[in-house]
Amino acid sequence: SAHTSKGQILEKWTPFLTHPEIDEHWTPQDWSFMGNPLDHIVWDWHQDRDLNVETGKIVFLDVKAAKSQLSTKQRRIRDLVKAGRIEWREIRLD
């Protein structure tokens, strides 16, 4: 539908917008588009390693039209993030 197409276009342009939920220091290079189940990951970090560990963060960001709701999967992700249930894993393949 036209609403879906408009939403998909706006999702991709979000890094270039001004909005209260977008920190002013984020640049478009700080954003990675995912699309599904969340729209973006924002890498809010610093080049200095110690400062980064102290104040840097990774932001999961979803773009919604004014009245649309999070999907069940998006709510689950939000709840796990808020509960601190995130871990790092690395897989090395030879």
Range-by-range predicted roles:
Residues 61-64, 71, 75-76, 92-93:
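Eukaryotic charge-rich
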Residues 87-91:
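General small-molecule cofactor/ligand-binding pocket signal
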Residues 39-42, 48-67:
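Conserved catalytic cores of phosphodiester-cleaving nucleases, focusing on short active-site segments
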Residues 1-38, 43-48, 70-86:
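Acidic-basic catalytic patches of nuclease active cores, encompassing PD-(D/E)XK
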